[in-house]
């Protein structure tokens, strides 16, 4: 029974739960790695060992957080749980493929962990640039294991993307147009399209790297007519859409949370929100070289990538102001989920502004590979994606479990986390402006103060993580069941009660559309 339910599952709710548990576990691993980084940088001098081991930790931290925490939780966890419920589908379009998508992830994670334990580990950074990732600078199996790990995670995501696209387009009630589906469903659809287009390019790039390392090809080796810059183009053509893949489902969740706790029946500017997400998805594919301003591109190329990157700020601004307009005049309920959503809007905007700074190719020459970049992307990830995940979790936890979290603890948890992440990453802007480079395990004494403060902030965030584990335990131990749910047209996932029955929408849904 246990094996049939949890290993051979074809139920979108159970698979969503598996994704959430896996992502939570990976999140703990990623947090542990990040604390190793901040412990090393807490004061000048060496703590862990040489720079190779430090870079292995940095690389693993990035891969774990991106491929095994944010994507499984947002797309696999919330996506699987909510999309079928929101469109009235009995399950996903391909339930067994759904199960395979999940079970490809633990072996992938295993390969990544193995890569850090054989030879010297993969100390390449998550970008895995050759020649550093070649078989000279990284002899041994480490980088090959990392590449195989990425292959598995990529296949998992591609299959998941096919599944979500088919489900969302094909399994709605016949009377329901695509423009009547909730914004979270839209965000997952657009994310899935991005995955489907971006991941094959990454697969091509890392497969060429694999053959360069093992079969004497020279795709990225100038000695044989190759070019390492080709790898950078291939990687970032995936890498930039990837960062939008990480944030778009968060946009969808924030739209639902803000609408719900503002007492509104619909978000402000629904069509504007949809088109903004589609614009972001499209523009995300034509700005990749802004990661490469320092490799010596033509001035006209740099001008194009600078302006194209800045244009992404427009649809993003549409979303931010639509969230604010949704709040406007609402009967705002200061629930923990709403606090996460408001924190998201503020901090994501701050991260977006530093992104506009970095979009300037001339400024980026100075700021590239400094802590300014680290601060920028941790504001949009550690305070964008993670805040959206936390907000979505405390909002939908009663739906998933049938129990309610302690609201006071949840607000305290938000406060600790808010202080922790800001204390960690705000000082890094100053470090970057003073020229402290990324990916070094040591630094001149002049940078000590801000690094010490940053490392203290990371340990505050750690207490927040531990408090969250306690909150979840407390909710299951206290068993406060959900009594009533306020239903509107925009939150139909609550229709079947908390938690919903194992099978929902077993017969086709009748939709009466105005």
Swiss-Prot record:
Mitochondrial intermembrane side: 41-50, 118-140, 213-227, 287-298, 358-370, 434-446
MF-aspect GO terms: cytochrome-c oxidase activity; heme binding; metal ion binding
Record membrane topology: Multi-pass membrane protein
One GO CC term on file: respiratory chain complex IV
Residues involved in Mg(2+) binding: 368-369
Biological or metabolic pathway of the protein: Energy metabolism; oxidative phosphorylation
Cofactor note: Binds 2 heme A groups non-covalently per subunit. Binds a copper B center.
InterPro entries attached to this UniProt entry: Cyt_c_oxase-like_su1_dom, Cyt_c_oxase-like_su1_sf, Cyt_C_Oxase_1, Cyt_c_Oxase_su1_BS, Cyt_c_oxase_su1_dom
Catalysed reactions, semicolon-separated: 4 Fe(II)-[cytochrome c] + O2 + 8 H(+)(in) = 4 Fe(III)-[cytochrome c] + 2 H2O + 4 H(+)(out)
Known partners and oligomeric status: Component of the cytochrome c oxidase (complex IV, CIV), a multisubunit enzyme composed of 14 subunits. The complex is composed of a catalytic core of 3 subunits MT-CO1, MT-CO2 and MT-CO3, encoded in the mitochondrial DNA, and 11 supernumerary subunits COX4I, COX5A, COX5B, COX6A, COX6B, COX6C, COX7A, COX7B, COX7C, COX8 and NDUFA4, which are encoded in the nuclear genome.
Family: Belongs to the heme-copper respiratory oxidase family.
Name of this protein: Cytochrome c oxidase subunit 1
């Amino acid at each position: 029974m246990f094996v049939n339910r949890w290993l051979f599952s074809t139920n979108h709710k159970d698979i969503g739960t598996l994704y959430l548990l896996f992502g939570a576990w990976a999140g703990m691993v990623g947090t542990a790695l990040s604390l190793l980084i901040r412990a090393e940088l807490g004061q000048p001098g060496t703590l862990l060992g040489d720079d190779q081991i430090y870079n292995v930790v940095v690389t693993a931290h990035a891969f774990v957080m991106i491929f095994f925490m944010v994507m499984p939780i947002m797309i696999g966890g919330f996506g699987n749980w909510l999309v079928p419920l929101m469109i009235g589908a009995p399950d996903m379009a391909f339930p067994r493929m759904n199960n395979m998508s999940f079970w490809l992830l633990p072996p992938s994670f295993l390969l990544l962990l193995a890569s850090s334990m054989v030879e010297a580990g993969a100390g390449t950074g998550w970008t895995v640039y050759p020649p550093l990732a070649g078989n000279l600078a990284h002899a041994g199996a480490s980088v090959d294991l990392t590449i195989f790990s990425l292959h598995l995670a990529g296949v998992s995501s591609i299959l998941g993307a096919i599944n979500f696209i088919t489900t969302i387009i094909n399994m709605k009630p016949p009377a329901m147009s695509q423009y009547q589906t909730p914004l979270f469903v839209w965000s997952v659809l657009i994310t899935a399209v991005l995955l489907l287009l971006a991941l094959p390019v990454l697969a091509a790039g890392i497969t060429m790297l694999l053959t360069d390392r093992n079969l004497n090809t020279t795709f990225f080796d100038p000695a044989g007519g190759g070019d390492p810059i080709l790898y950078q183009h291939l990687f970032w053509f995936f890498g930039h859409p990837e960062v939008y893949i990480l944030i778009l489902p968060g946009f969808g969740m924030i739209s639902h949370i803000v609408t719900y706790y503002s007492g509104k029946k619909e978000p402000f500017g629904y069509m504007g929100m949809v088109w903004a997400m589609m614009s972001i998805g499209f523009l995300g594919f034509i700005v990749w070289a802004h990661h490469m301003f320092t490799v010596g591109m033509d001035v006209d190329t740099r001008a194009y990538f600078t302006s194209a990157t800045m244009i992404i700020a427009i649809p993003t601004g549409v979303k931010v102001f639509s969230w604010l307009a949704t709040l406007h005049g609402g009967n705002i309920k200061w629930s923990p989920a709403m606090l996460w959503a408001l924190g998201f809007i503020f901090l994501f905007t701050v991260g977006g502004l530093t992104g506009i700074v970095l979009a300037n190719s001339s400024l980026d020459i100075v700021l590239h590979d400094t802590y300014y970049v680290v601060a920028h992307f941790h504001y949009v990830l550690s305070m964008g994606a993670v805040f959206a995940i936390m907000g979505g979790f405390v909002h939908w936890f009663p739906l998933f479990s049938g129990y309610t979290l302690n609201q006071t603890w949840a607000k305290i948890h938000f406060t600790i986390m808010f202080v922790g992440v800001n204390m960690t990453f705000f000082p890094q802007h100053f470090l970057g402006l003073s020229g402290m480079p990324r990916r070094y395990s040591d630094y001149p004494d002049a940078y000590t103060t801000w690094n010490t403060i940053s490392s203290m902030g990371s340990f505050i965030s750690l207490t927040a993580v531990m408090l969250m584990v306690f909150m979840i335990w407390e909710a299951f131990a206290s068993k406060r069941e959900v009594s009533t749910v306020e239903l509107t047209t925009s939150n139909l996932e609550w229709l079947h009660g908390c938690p919903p029955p194992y099978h929902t929408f077993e017969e086709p849904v009748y939709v009466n559309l105005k």
